[in-house]
Amino acid sequence: MNQQQLINLAFTAADNAYAPYSNYKVGACLLCKDGNYFLGANIENASYGDTNCAERSAVFAAYSYGYRKDDFDTLCIVCYGKTIAAPCGICRQVLSELLNQDTPIVLANKENSMVTTIAELLPMQFTSEDMK
């Protein structure tokens, strides 16, 4: 699957977002090495803390099906905003644990895209090693 196909699938997920408060729809597509993929959309709640972001939705779905970080090929996150989608702090922390450090992460909107990694997005990570 090429990058544009991933972006298109992620926009399909964004179209299913539940964002009545922010109207900021985000979608994600997590491609696995075996060719399967998982979609995620942001799901908002009147109690904002209960909102779940698109990238966490996709990664959690994959984990629910038994996939783990070594099974992932690429994560793609998109939005309809003026700037490319970028994971929030909570998502960066979650992705730092549930993705390999060098897993490509495609960030895009309708006009632009870039490829990064969680190591680049969150250089000083809090890990289980910090609790020892």
Residue locations for each model-derived region?
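Generic helix-packing signal
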Residues: 14-17, 32, 44, 62-66, ...
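Short beta-strand scaffold segments in enzyme catalytic cores
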Residues: 25-32
